């Protein structure tokens, strides 16, 4: 099973696609998301969001001003005030 992931900033879509895992820093600590994760809404802390693709590729984005992370039915949406790719490619 895979996750449908969308990472957006206030200005644009930063990345979207399928992944096997998402790791993000929240105000309560780091969270790792795999397929089948319980529905969750979390407040992001400034830091990195790491997306591990199904083919082994890794995408890393830096979130500067926080935002939120929504998980529901294997869909992960990361909405950040400011976000930019550090490594990996935009899709």
Language-model regions, residue ranges each:
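Compact, glycine-rich, soluble single-domain proteins
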Residues: 4-91
